[in-house]
């Protein structure tokens, strides 16, 4: 699952011809999130928008926000999302302008900076195609005196409609305790 996740994340900076919203040293603030949402709506990204970003970026937003809730049900996960599948990734923030925000801890830092690429997109921007579902096999390795668990899957991830999303750059470094 992590491999598939990182394959999808790697496509985000290419969305919309490489358009990146925000920049290095910019926090995932309410103002920046509103700017990204308004840009997405003004440029016809679609009607089922979502944002995915690193938990540290989302924490920065929730720290400054008075609209937090503790569960997907309490926060009202936007209609059309499968709560049972996504509640563990849902940030718990009430949707901002109707846009749900999800967290993904697999988003990595961009080279030597503390920022990372999240995404704002419509549900029709990207697709995953599975030709073989995940299979788990056990393989005995006598030299290690162990049994390895091998997982395989055959899938592809790709941009379905490039114009329906854009990368969203923000700081993802650890928050301070002060």
Predicted regions: what they are:
Residues 1-43, 47, 169-178:
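Alpha-helical scaffold segments that mediate packing/assembly in large oligomeric complexes
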Residues 7-22, 53-63, 94, 100-105:
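Internal, well-folded beta-alpha domain core
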Residues 16, 25, 32, 43-47, ...:
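Detector for Asparagine
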Residues 21, 29-39, 57, 63, ...:
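Aromatic-enriched hydrophobic runs in primary sequence
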Residues 32-73:
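Hydrophobic, aromatic-enriched interface-forming segments
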Residues 64-178:
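Sequence/fold signature of self-assembling virion shell proteins
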